[in-house]
Amino acid sequence: MIDRFGRSIEDLRVTLTHVCNFSCFFCHMEGEDNSQSLLSPEEISLVAKVGIEYGIRSVKLTGGEPTLRRDLLQIIRELKDVGIKEVSMTTNGVLLSTLAWKLKEVGLDRVNVSLHSLDKQLFKEITGVDALDKVIEGIKEAIKAGLRPLKLNFVLTKKNISQLDNIINFAIETGVDELHLIELHPVGLGKNTFEYHEKLESIEKILKERADKIEIRSKHYRPRYYLNNLVIEVVKPYANPIFCAGCNRIRLTADGKLKTCLYRQDKEIDIMDILRGDFSLEEKIELIREAYEIAIAIREPNFKYKVESYAPS
């Protein structure tokens, strides 16, 4: 199904929990407020199953830290059972060394692992946890288990810009498939720490000189730089109408809302009462369909082109 700006929805991002065993100072918290309510595996899979009718093909599990959900394996299994083609997860990686093979076995396809420093002291300063060795171990185990392409997420700030070369070399040597250089943006805790914002333009200039090949990813018009067997992708979502023009995501919050945009809290459809109301399964499915249709109808880019025609030529 296409929204009024010509954008399809193909990816459902599901926040499994707001709880995290890290405390990164810039966390955007998926643009959500803290909530104690958690959707069950059955509720998540039902929303995803109905979403397939509207174009959903992939589900990204996020948090908080999704590996803290004790029913994570069941959630992944049920998403696969209802027909989701790709299930991926963003994680801090600290529990990945013990979970990687189990995750692969139940159907998880790939992971994004957040890694913002290879210096132990700086890692602890950024995350609040002395766990760098465990994260590195988790990355290596995930690669062995076949959770690929394995992608590293590196949020660039004034604190860790000196770490970038080390991160690139580590990624190449370890067999990481992609490295995402992510611009700090003022959402969640990032609103209070934007003083650490570091522009990516100077980094891109260096990457252009070092890259074996450069291509532009059609979705979001992101540049991708090839260094040896590593792909480095630059992610600049904030105040970026090109990023919004290519957005194919809709979000399911931990407390049961369909959220149409990371940056907006005024365009959400609360479906918790549907999921937990006294309705038959058929009635729930029909009401969730209506919720998707409303969400798609009100969905709009947060950052727009200042022209009549929205999509870039």
From Swiss-Prot:
Pathway it works in: Cofactor biosynthesis; molybdopterin biosynthesis
Enzyme Commission identifier(s): 4.1.99.22
Source taxonomy: Archaea, Thermoproteota, Thermoprotei, Sulfolobales, Sulfolobaceae
Purpose: Catalyzes the cyclization of GTP to (8S)-3',8-cyclo-7,8-dihydroguanosine 5'-triphosphate.
Similarity remark: Belongs to the radical SAM superfamily. MoaA family.
Organism: Sulfurisphaera tokodaii (strain DSM 16993 / JCM 10545 / NBRC 100140 / 7)
Superkingdom of origin organism: Archaea
Full protein name: Probable GTP 3',8-cyclase
Binding-site list for GTP: R13, K60, T90, K151, R249, I250, R251
